[in-house]
């Protein structure tokens, strides 16, 4: 990428996200790529999370949406598809989801006001794809399952029909 999310957000100017995406998209198209696995729309709620620390835009929901929309616009103007990630949201704890399952332990209401708002608004704006993370969201899995699951029954979004079908596809659209 041309710039990381944190550096982009530090500019306090969503046009930086747009311009970085245009440069990256132009370069990627020149070598035959038509799909960008970005932007990262995780929220940095735990500074110890080394995966999200510099890759996310920030902890602010509305600013994250603003920068992501600008990034998506810049990328798609280069005829590239974009991917928002890592559903259901990284950045709340310290686990590296590439090594072990991350756990987004927010309750359903808090999740909807934060990560849910980010995903919902970007889906409504027409983002092309969403990447699931190896991250569990126990509150939503239990709510959609309609029962109190034991901890060993909690699955990451990559393997969880309640999160992918129930939450992402049916509730968020």
Language-model features and meaning:
Residues 1, 20-45, 64-91:
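Glycine-rich, aromatic-flanked loop segments that form ligand/cofactor-binding clefts
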Residues 1-9, 46-57, 96-102:
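Surface-exposed, active-site-proximal loop segments in enzymatic domains
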Residues 2, 16, 23, 41, ...:
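Extended aliphatic helical segments
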Residues 3, 11-14, 33, 56, ...:
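Generic serine detector
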Residues 10-26, 61-66, 109-113:
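Glycine-rich anion/phosphate-binding loops
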Residues 59-173:
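Second-shell residues forming the walls of enzyme active-site clefts
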